[in-house]
Each structure stands twice: as C-alpha cells, then as structure tokens.
C-alpha cells in the first residue's frame, strides 16, 4: 500500500496545480494543506518522562532513557523526520538538540555550567517536532508533552565554616560537665554528603577537654582555679567528604573558683630593693568570707628570718664596733674573736667566716690564755652571747659547757660556769672563802623553750651578786630555781678559762676537756666590774629588718595591733572585715641596712575567725609568700694621696715627728649603667658604666709597717687620743702598725689619718720607711685598695779631702765660697724632687773643673774669669790664701738675698787680686789675715791651714759639702 500511495503523490500534486491554477494564492495554500494532511498523517512519539543527572559546573546531562523521537510517517521525507525538540519553561538553562533527523535521536545539554548551590534539580516539559510537509516548516506536527526531571550532582567545593569566630564559656572548678558548650559549623555545598558536618576535633593538645561529633565540648577531669584559671583551645570541623574547616575556631574556657574563704589578690614573690625604705607587702589584699557570718578576725603576720645570720639581718660589724656603736661601756673582753696572731685560741675552731659564727660539734674546746680575763670579776659583771642550740642528745644528757673557769691542775673545782643541761640554762658562780664565808646562792636555773629550738637568740646575763638576771632577745627572765652552796676553800691552784668545754685538771689520769657543747656561738663577751643597761642590750640584739605599718594614724577604728620586740611578728585584731583589709594593706617590710644581706625572707599570714552563733565557722588558709631582698650595690673604696715624699732628718727627730698622710682621701664609688649612643643609627642603646660617689661608714683602718716591725727604742707611730675620742673612734698601737676601729663616716677616718705621725729618734741609720693602709666596711665585707706610702730621710753627708781621688775636682784655695740663693718655694719643691739638687751640684763641679784648668796656665786670667763667673751668678767672695777653703752647695737651703754684702765683697776681691799679683813674697800672714777676715763674713764650714806654700801655688784643701738627698 505504501508504494502505491507514494505513486499517487505526483498525481495529486498535478491535479491540484491544474485545477487551482486560476484561483490565486488562497487556493494554493489550501491545496498544500490538503496535500500535507494526506502525506504527514502521524505525530512524533517520545517517552512520557525522562530522568537526568548533570554534574555541577558541567553542561552534559545524562538522561534515562535517552531522547529518541519516532514518527510513523517515516520514511516519507520531512513528514517522517524529526526536526526539533522544544523545551517549555521560562529561563531554563537547558536546550535540546537533534542529533539525527531520520532516527529521531536527540541530546539534552546545559546552556552554561550549573551551580548546585543555586538550584539542586529542574523539571520541565519537552516535545518533539517532525519536519512537516517540506522544508518551509509547514504543517509540523509535535509530539505529546514529556516531563523531564533533572537532578544536579554536587561537587565538594566548599569547606566547613563555624558560625562564630570564637566561643567562650565559664565553668566552676571541681566539676565534671557533660557539655560545657556546643560549637557549630556549616557547609555551603548543596548535597547532604558535602553539606553536612560529620566530625569535630580539638586541635590543641594536652588539654583536659573532649568534643563529640555534634560539637559538644566537655571536660575530662576536674578543673582547678589555683592550677589554671583559663584555657584556650582550637577546634576544627570536617564535612562528610572529610574536608576540614578553612579556619579553626577559638574556644575560651574560664575556670571560676568555688567560693573558698581566704585572702585574695596577694603576690607570692615580693622584691625589695636595698635602700627603698618601707615597702607595702599586701597593697591589694582582701578577705573573701563567702558570706560567712564573721564576728571578729585576728591576723598574724610573721617574718621568718631565723635562717639568716643570727636570726635576722643585723649589722655585721665586729663585736667591739657594735659595742661602741650601741654606747656600751668600755672594758669588754671578746672571748671568741677572729683568729689572729694576738688572738690565736680560736684558730682551731670551726667558723663561718662571713658572720664569725663558731660551731661546736661536741669534740672541740678552746683555752683562753692567762691574763685575758681578770681572776676577780667583782660582784658586778656581764656575759653576752649569741647561741643556737637544739635538743640535747640522749635521755640523760650531760652538761654542755659554754663558758667554764675551773682548776688547771690537781682538782676539778668549777669557780664559775655557764652551761646547758636538759634544755635549761644554768649559771654557776662559786665565791671564795676570802670573799664570803656563808651559805650563798651559787646556781641559777632558767627553763625556756627557746634554749633548744634550734634558733638564734641573744642572751645577756647581768650579775649583781647575789642577784642574777637573764635577758633573752631583750626580754627579762628571772631564774626559776636558785640553789645555794658554800664558798670554795682557798688554794694556790691556777685556774683555766675555757669556751665550748670545761677543763678537767684533776681526778683524771691526764687533764682533758669534758662536758662539750653542741651548737653555735657568736659574740661571746665578758665585761668585769660593770653591768649593761637595758638600752644597750636592746641595741646589741636589734634587728635591722622587720615588719612595719605605714601611717598608724590612718588605721581603721577598732583595730588593735601588737609587735614583738624584734618586729618580726605583727598581730592585728578587729571585728570589721573592711577595716582589717585596709589595715593589712598598710603592713610593710623595712630593712634599714645600707648593704642588707641578699636572699629570701619567708612571710606567713595566718588568721583566726569567730562567727556569730555558728557551730562551724569558716576556715581561712594561711598565706605563704616570700620577700626577695636583692643584691645591694657593692661599693669600691679607694684610698688616694701622696705615695712618696722626703723629709729632713731633723723633722723625724722633732717632738711632733712627720705627718704621714696629710692629704689622704677616702672615696667610695659604684658603677652605674647608663644607656647612651644614637638610637636612630644603631637601633639599640649601648650601655656605659658611670662611676658615682656614695657615702657610707667604715669600721676600721689598719696602718701596717712594711719591711720589718717598728723598733720601740727609736721609732713609733703616734696619734692624739683626743682626735679619736671626739670622733667616737678607738685605736690600738703595736710594733706592727696602728689599727683605728669604730663605726664612723669616711670623713671621720680621713681626719684621724691626717693626724697620724711617725717619729724616729735616730734617723741617721734610716733611709726609707714604708707603710700601708687598708680600710674596711662591715668587718671586711668591703675593703679598700692597699695604699702604700714610702717616706725617705734627707741626710747631711760630710766629704773630706782625703776622699777625692781626682784632685782636679777639689776647689783651689783661692776660690771663695759660692752661694746659690733660692726661695722657700724652691726648697719645698726640691724636697719632693731631689734630682734638681743633683743637677745643680754636677753643674757647679763642672764649673770648678773648668776654672781650675784655666788657673794652671795663668792665675791672673783664671782669677779674672772666675770674677766674671761669680758676677754673672752673683756668687760670694774669694780669698787668695793657702788656708783651707769652705764650699757649700745646698740648693734647698734658704739664703739671704743676692745683694747682701755684694759691693763690699767685690771691692775686697779687687784689692786682694792686685796685692797677690804685685808680689808673691809678701808673706802668708797678710793673706791669711785677709782670708780670715773674708771668711768671717761668709762661712759655712771649718778651714784648715797649709804649712808650706809652693812657688806655683800647690793647693792643700779640706772642704765640707752639705748635700741634701
């Protein structure tokens, strides 16, 4: 049938054309429609629905099923072909294209890359169109409408981001939380796979926190406010494609303390700069009571310094200097001095040299030499000491002797002793029969906890027999037990005074020490015939550091306070917490030493609370802090002055002698670092040290004699005692030197040193003496340089004619005495620089040699030449006789003016010259008379005479030359 129909098409077309040839265009179109209707009988056919997938950022759509349109008019040209696929919808990003008109195959594609985040899926209508009856798109037939559903496939292009840049939470210490807070992140991808957050993670390590997949953060252990008050952790997030967050978020967790009663806002370490005065310790402290019903409060601040020196920071001057500083009476005897040549009995003891603390280990004792302490202490005397002692070893401990005066041999009697027995301090004093013959008090016992507390305490025993009083740390204690005894029978046995043990001279095969002391002692002294006052005792044991209160008048009402004697403990009481807080903020630390001991001072604050009608009251923990005393600036003490000078021998022999240090200066400096330089050029400030002068005290200056001790038979060092006393200093003198001691300013020591003199009764055998000065502050803690002085003696030397080997240097007898007048200032300069005198002497001798050489040829010419020389130098007159000639060359001696007797001398010289030239046989008598007459006017030595005078003037001369070295 189909081939038959195709055969009819040309026929029908021919008929249509023939029949309608004359009716116009309307007839033609009607005929074409009729023809098409007969040829394009069927509509294209497609599936009713399509499902497709397109990948994000791509244009290819994968459809299921594929687009294929069928037309039953095929294979008729145009009518059986598919010409187009059309999509119905507004602004759809897709288009459908025909791949093959005959087969009807098509393809759906995107006009531009698809963004899933804008739209995840699309639904639209599509229809297929055949080609109709011809190429003019006439009579196209379209298929039914098919539904196309396209889903956009997502790409994981976005990373998770947190909703908040930072999170903050507050937790209470001591609790475990299921969730402290929740962090949340989002992802802008469109698919569930890439847009959902599948995991959270804590980036910060070693923190007591964990996080779950939902972002909930919890703590894994109990948090402590005291251990750490804030935590900062970083958290990241992952989407289900395991892409991490672009930026981590910060989570800050603050730990809030559980309300605990106690002191708040105080600093554990407190630094103290030396010289800063009184420094507040708790400027911001306050008490947290947690709403407790507190009725009253007692606060105790304790400065713990028992491990420093002798219990606290005290002046480290020598015991003699401290006694002098505190105004103690003279006559103190130091039983534990620093080891030296004069005090060698402490050389074998264990000692802490920095503080002069002697340690006794139960095996040591020291014998005090005879004569150090008088045998009769009288009824009044004082014993002082620093002692540190612990519990006695053993159940029945034996006596531990501190000081003992016992028989040296034969017997074992104790005349007086101070010892510790079972933590009791006992003082024994046995009178002799010649002092008393009745039953008298002999042993005095004190029972104090401080004796065995292993801490330093200052003990003073004042004896005014029969009353004995103990002062410990400034407080007075009466003996709890006094036992009586008979006086000691008189004997001629010598006594032995010991420290650290008692000497057992009798009742044993060999005398030995016994009853050894275990502990530490310092500043053990005894003062016979005098009791010490309470003021001096307080001064000697006073601490230079302690607690203080700034502005006592500003303390709140109802505040009571109390200091212990050393100001190391302060107790404050009150019923108002606010007033207590203000009062405690005014508590300060002060150290009055210019050079305090550096180191730690522990500080404890304890509290006692009473509450209103409460069975259980709050408990306030102690505050443990410490004060760090920084190192003080160390001074550099420098001695300056003349290091060498010369003095005439007569001055050494005079009553006042020679002043050794007339211009000495004592200067103390310290190095101060300052920033300098060009900051713009270097970027940093270089530091330079600048010396600045500082003022402080000295405690001794030693003047040592170098090159051998002084010979007391012919030399000594002298110093007026008034110079010392008016400056509150003392001194000791020996053949080894002079020692000035006492706490005083550097200017006081300068003034005293300016008056120190050296005398020598026989300086003829002395050429030089050398001395050395060395000064100290704080008992040798800071010492000066060693200043050396050399003193030389200017001697008068006599030279006779027999000592001249070369007779050309002997002055001829016709030369008169020559003077070299100089002023006093020249003499003073020459005393310092003796080389000037030597130069003048050499020049004078050369002149004389020249004159003698000329005189050999012609006496007249020599005489005239000498006159010219003497006129030029304004010298003295000459004599022509053969008698002895005196020549004095002393450029350092003060002479009369150059014009004295000048005219008269010149006239006489001319007359004598004429007489000598006219007749050589005029006799020696006249010449001798003239010479004696001239020498009577100018004479500095003794002249001798010649028994015979040769024709050509043979000279025999005896001369004296005074030379100051």
Swiss-Prot record:
Biased composition (Basic and acidic residues): 892-902
Location(s) in or outside the cell: Postsynaptic cell membrane; Endoplasmic reticulum membrane; Golgi apparatus membrane; Cell projection, Dendrite
InterPro entries: Cadherin-like_dom, Cadherin-like_sf, CLSTN_C, ConA-like_dom_sf
Cytoplasmic domain ranges by topology: 857-965
Residues exposed to the Extracellular side: 21-835
Spans traversing the lipid bilayer: 836-856
UniProt keyword list: Calcium, Cell adhesion, Cell membrane, Cell projection, Endoplasmic reticulum, Glycoprotein, Golgi apparatus, Membrane, Postsynaptic cell membrane, Repeat, Signal, Synapse, Transmembrane, Transmembrane helix
Region (Disordered): 891-965
The record's account of how the chain is modified after translation: Proteolytically processed under normal cellular conditions. A primary zeta-cleavage generates a large extracellular (soluble) N-terminal domain (sAlc) and a short C-terminal transmembrane fragment (CTF1). A secondary cleavage catalyzed by gamma-secretase within the transmembrane domain releases the beta-Alc-gamma chain in the extracellular milieu and produces an intracellular fragment (AlcICD). This processing is strongly suppressed in the tripartite complex formed with APBA2 and APP, which seems to prevent the association with PSEN1.
Main location: membrane
GO biological process: associative learning; chemical synaptic transmission; homophilic cell adhesion via plasma membrane adhesion molecules; inhibitory synapse assembly; positive regulation of synapse assembly; positive regulation of synaptic transmission
Keyword Magnesium: no
GO cellular component: cell surface; dendrite; endoplasmic reticulum membrane; glutamatergic synapse; Golgi membrane; postsynaptic density; postsynaptic density membrane; postsynaptic membrane
Membrane protein topology class: Single-pass type I membrane protein
A Pfam family reported for this protein in Swiss-Prot or TrEMBL: Cadherin
Domain comment (free text): Binds synaptic Ca(2+) with its cytoplasmic domain.
Family: Belongs to the calsyntenin family.
Function: Postsynaptic adhesion molecule that binds to presynaptic neurexins to mediate synapse formation, and which is involved in learning and memory. Promotes synapse development by acting as a cell adhesion molecule at the postsynaptic membrane, which associates with neurexin-alpha at the presynaptic membrane.
This protein's name: Calsyntenin-2
Organism: Rattus norvegicus
Lineage: Eukaryota, Metazoa, Chordata, Craniata, Vertebrata
Gene: Clstn2
């Amino acid at each position: 049938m189909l081939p038959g129909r195709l055969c009819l098409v040309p026929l029908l077309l021919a008929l249509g054309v023939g029949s309608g040839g004359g009716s116009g265009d309307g007839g033609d179109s009607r005929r074409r429609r009729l023809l098409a209707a007969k040829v394009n009988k069927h509509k294209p056919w497609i599936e009713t629905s399509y499902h497709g997938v397109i990948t994000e950022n791509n244009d290819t759509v994968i459809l299921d099923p594929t687009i294929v349109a069928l037309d039953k008019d095929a294979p008729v040209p145009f009518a059986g072909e598919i010409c187009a696929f059309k999509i119905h919808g507004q602004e759809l990003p897709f288009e459908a294209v025909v791949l093959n008109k005959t087969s009807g195959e098509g393809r759906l594609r995107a006009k531009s890359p698809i963004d899933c985040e804008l739209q995840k899926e699309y639904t639209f209508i599509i229809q297929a169109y055949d080609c109709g009856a011809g190429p003019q798109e006439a009579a196209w037939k379209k298929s039914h409408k098919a539904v196309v559903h396209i889903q956009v496939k997502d790409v994981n292009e976005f990373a998770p981001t947190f909703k908040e840049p930072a999170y903050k939470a507050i937790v209470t210490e001591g609790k475990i939380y299921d969730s402290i807070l929740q962090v949340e992140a989002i992802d802008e991808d469109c698919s569930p796979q890439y847009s959902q957050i599948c995991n959270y993670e804590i980036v910060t390590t070693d923190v007591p926190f964990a996080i779950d997949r939902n972002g909930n953060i919890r703590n894994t252990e109990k948090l402590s406010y005291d251990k750490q008050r804030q935590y900062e952790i970083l958290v990241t997030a992952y989407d289900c494609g395991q892409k991490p967050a672009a930026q981590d978020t910060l989570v800050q967790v603050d730990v809030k303390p559980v309300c605990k009663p106690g002191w708040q806002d105080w600093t554990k370490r407190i630094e103290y700069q030396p010289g800063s005065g009184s420094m507040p310790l708790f400027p911001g402290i306050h008490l947290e009571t947690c709403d407790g019903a507190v009725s009253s409060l007692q606060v105790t601040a304790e400065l713990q310094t028992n491990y420093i020196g002798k219990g606290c920071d005290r002046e480290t001057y020598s015991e003699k200097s401290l006694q002098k500083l505190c105004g103690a009476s003279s006559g103190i005897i130091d039983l534990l001095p620093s080891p030296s040549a004069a005090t060698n009995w402490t050389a074998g003891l264990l000692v802490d040299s920095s503080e002069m603390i002697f340690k006794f280990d139960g095996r040591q004792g020291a014998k005090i030499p005879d004569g150090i302490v008088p045998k009769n202490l009288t009824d009044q005397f004082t014993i002082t000491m620093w002692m540190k002692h612990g519990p006695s070893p053993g159940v029945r401990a034996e006596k531990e002797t501190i000081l003992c005066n016992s028989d040296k041999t034969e017997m074992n009697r104790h005349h007086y002793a101070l010892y510790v027995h079972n933590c009791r301090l006992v003082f024994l004093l046995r009178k002799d029969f010649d002092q008393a013959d009745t039953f008298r008090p002999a042993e005095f016992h004190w029972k104090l906890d401080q004796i065995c507390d292993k801490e330093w305490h200052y003990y003073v025993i004042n004896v005014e027999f029969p009353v004995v009083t103990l002062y410990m740390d400034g407080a007075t204690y009466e003996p709890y037990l006094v036992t009586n005894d008979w006086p000691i029978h008189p004997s001629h046995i010598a006594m032995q005074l010991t420290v650290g043990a008692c000497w057992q001279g009798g009742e044993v095969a060999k005398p030995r020490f016994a009853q050894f002391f275990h502990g530490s002692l310092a500043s053990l002294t005894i003062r016979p015939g005098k009791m010490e006052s309470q003021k001096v005792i307080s001064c000697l044991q006073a601490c230079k550091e302690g607690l203080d209160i700034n502005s006592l008048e500003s303390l709140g009402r109802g505040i009571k306070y109390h200091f212990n004697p050393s100001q190391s403990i302060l107790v404050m009481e009150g019923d108002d917490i606010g007033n207590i807080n203000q009062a405690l903020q005014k508590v300060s630390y002060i150290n009055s030493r210019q050079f305090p001991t550096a180191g730690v001072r522990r500080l404890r604050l304890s509290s006692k609370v009473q509450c209103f009608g409460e069975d259980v009251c709050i408990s306030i923990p102690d505050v443990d802090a410490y004060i760090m005393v920084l190192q003080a600036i160390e001074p550099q003490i420098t001695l300056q002055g003349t290091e060498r000078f010369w003095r005439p021998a007569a001055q050494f022999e005079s009553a006042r002698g020679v002043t050794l240090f007339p211009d000495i200066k004592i200067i103390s400096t310290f190095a101060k670092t300052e920033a300098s330089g060009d900051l713009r050029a270097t970027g940093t400030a270089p530091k330079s040290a600048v010396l600045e002068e500082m003022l402080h005290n000295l405690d001794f200056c030693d003047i040592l004699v170098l090159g051998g001790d002084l010979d007391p038979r012919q030399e000594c060092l002298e110093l007026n005692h008034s110079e010392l006393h008016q400056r509150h200093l003392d001194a000791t003198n020996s053949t080894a030197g002079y020692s000035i001691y006492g706490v005083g300013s550097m200017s006081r020591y300068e003034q005293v040193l300016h008056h120190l003199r050296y005398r020598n009764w026989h300086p003829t055998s002395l050429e030089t003496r050398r001395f050395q000065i060395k000064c100290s502050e704080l008992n040798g803690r800071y010492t000066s340089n060693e200043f050396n002085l050399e003193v030389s003696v200017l001697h008068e030397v006599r030279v006779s004619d027999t000592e001249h080997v070369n007779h050309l240097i002997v002055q001829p007898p016709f030369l008169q005495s020559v003077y070299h007048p100089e002023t006093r200032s020249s003499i003073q300069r020459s005393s310092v620089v003796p080389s000037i005198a030597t130069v003048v002497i050499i020049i004078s001798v050369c002149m004389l040699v020249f004159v003698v050489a000329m005189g050999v040829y012609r006496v007249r010419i020599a005489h005239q030449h000498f006159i010219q020389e003497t006129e030029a130098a304004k010298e003295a007159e000459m004599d022509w006789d053969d008698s002895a000639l005196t020549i004095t060359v002393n450029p350092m001696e003060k002479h009369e003016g150059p014009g004295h007797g000048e005219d008269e001398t010149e006239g006489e010289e001319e007359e004598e010259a004429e007489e000598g030239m006219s007749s050589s046989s005029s006799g020696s008598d006249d010449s001798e008379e003239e010479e004696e007459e001239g020498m009577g006017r100018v004479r500095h030595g003794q002249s001798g005479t010649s028994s015979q005078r040769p024709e050509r003037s043979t000279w025999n001369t005896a001369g004296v030359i005074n030379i100051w070295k």
